Amino acid sequence: MSLIEEILSIENLNEAIKRVKANKGASGIDKMSVDMLEPYFNEHRKEIIESIMNKAYRPKPVRRVYIPKSNGKLRPLGIPTVVDRVIQQAIAQRLISIYENIFSDFSYGFRPSRDCHTAMNKVLEYLNQGFEWVIDLDIEKYFDTVNHDKLISILREQVNDSHTVHLIRKFLQAGVMDNGLVSSTTIGVPQGGPLSPILSNIYLDKFDKELESRGLHFVRYADDCNIFVRTDVAAERVMKSVTSWLERKLFLKVSATKTKIVKPTDSNFLGFTFWQSTSGWQCKPQDNRKGKLIEKIKIILKRKHAVSRPLGDTFTKLNQVIKGWINYFKIGNMKTWIRDTFGPWLRHKVRVIIVKQWKKPKTIYDNLMKVNKAYNNGFTDEEIYSVANTRLGWYRQCGTKTVNYLISADLLSKPNKKRNRPGLVNPLSYYLK
């Protein structure tokens, strides 16, 4: 069976449809949703396969959208139609089976059983072995500047099937629709489709192999690459050499201003930076990543929205953001920050919303008294009355010892089934578990 026949097999296409549906995602330029995929393929599968086998299949232009990057700029994405997405996914599944055993052990992005945690473990291994000079490579607009002819040439080294190579080139040249205008694509691999990650890794695998042949220690995650050496002199020499190689061999431009040589404490890789304890190098989230988490929570807890929203909905939104952030950065050392800074700040903000939802001093008094009696907290009637009727603003009122103690972390974390309200995640407990 040829590669294109494997790609178009019933099993492979069905798996592709299943994955595209599971990933959901926005519609392409034809507005077809993922929910329409199965009925569409049931009706048109035969003609789609025939057009591909006859080299007559024409992928539609991708729809250009922009998403914010961590540095505040916008990242362009290209959203294929859902039918094109299925074909891309089917190709990607077979390419992964070919390339996974070929790819470098030091490439971590978009690969099975690899993620930022495995990448960071390797970085820490290098640092603790004494490779403490870091070359932080920045490839300018990598996905937008991949050379099509070079990529096809690299593909042909492992993919000996003209139909498959032809189909991949068609996807590369499908064009982009931006604000209703279609422009051709003669360069680049648009991010947003299932084929983009594997093609980007295939292209940069040549770079990985070059670094390996030189005996260099490196970690690459998609287009983010750090190289680790023992001295600043070696770092200068390696940076010049690999920059030249990338530009000559892969036609990629390395940013002269963003590519830098740093010590680990000044390094920023995948949202982490580094510090040295008595037991060795460790990683932690960058300060700006902590700041972005806090900004997201501030948006959820914006008073005019959060006060009018059911508390259960607010807790659900908060839990989703906090758990997702901690899951990503869990490998980093951040116990002290979560315990002493983030956790108390979060609960203070939540208490403000709860007390403001109670509105009237009498309601505040009644509710605090209920908690006081239910948990035998021991506050006097006068203490609770004083807090409920204070002239302090909401924020200062909810910072008092009485409110902090009564609306405790434990109380907030308990779900309320009657009101269909989940418990608020305790960030420290979630991080430590």
What residue spans do the PLM features occupy?
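Non-catalytic, polymerase-adjacent accessory regions of viral genome-replication enzymes
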Residues: 1-42, 46
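A conserved non-catalytic segment of reverse transcriptases
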Residues: 173, 249-313, 321-323
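Short acidic (Asp/Glu) and glycine-rich catalytic loops that position anionic groups and cofactors
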Residues: 23-29, 99-103, 131-133, 147-149, ...
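Extended C-terminal regions of large enzymes
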Residues: 358-433
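Conserved phosphate-binding loops in nucleotide/dinucleotide-binding enzymes
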Residues: 76-77, 81, 283
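Right-hand nucleic-acid polymerase module
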Residues: 300-364
